[in-house]
């Protein structure tokens, strides 16, 4: 028998679809051109340079920064890198006796204390930039005191029995100036103003006639663009320029708040607060348990702000000072008063978003939202290192 011939199976030729030849340079170049053309025809904000995105984010307020950060990863990274959140002040409470002062963070409300014998037999007059402006109870001596660094800056005796006093910037600055004012009724109403600088040997005092009807309720003093401002409940904003010794009260249209001018609020406890933030002026009226009314000065005219136009602002008001913050996302659209709430577990606040006090039932028994035993004070970054 003849042997069977061996059978050799030849492999089929490779399919054109299975071939894996590298693309030619011309094909790769054409693909890159097509991808580039698609990007040009359909641009994406995600493709912007990170430096440009950061410049855009820097122009946005915190609320808009957070919204824009949700667009994509590159916008989120840029938004977080430039995001600035304001630091809220703390509540400082003065003891009825002794030298142990209480400090509370309005968010966490944990009690901290400082023993400050330097403030014995003194009363507070004003606070800003972390400094207290104090006056000795037994004399007319006034002085600056920083409760955290314990620094004291003495001032010459102030002979004016002032009603309001304030300072322009930290007393360690060469530009710091103090203003004390007193309204004096008479046949011709007048205002007496005294100014001083840290390091000066005396106060400079002047009298100015004022044609305003002296009103029972004045706001606190604030400093804005080389002038001190004050507001009275009758609706008049007046100012003093210390360099030129210029007193002025025709600087804005009168503001007629219904809490002051309508009879239904006649017997309610009221207060008025003036607030400055980055050169802008705000006025707030409170009236018993009614919603606080906030106005902003636009081109010398007052405009009432609503919940939507407040733009997330947070107010901190006290008998001695008023503060405003723009970038506090967890405290936005609120007013914090320098008064303890029920069982001293929090401070009284009002939410414009919820249109109510916190909590509503607590407020029924109160008239004075800002008692003279407490104020808001700016704290250093390492504030917890200073406490007992």
Swiss-Prot record:
Matching Pfam families: Beta-prop_KIB1-4, F-box
Region of interest (Disordered), residue spans: 1-30
Q: Which InterPro entries match?
A: F-box-like_dom_sf, F-box_dom, KIB1-4_b-propeller
What's the superkingdom here?
A: Eukaryota
Q: F-box domain spans which residues?
A: 42-88
Q: Which PANTHER family match?
A: F-BOX DOMAIN-CONTAINING PROTEIN, TRANSMEMBRANE PROTEIN
Protein name, entry field: F-box protein At4g00893
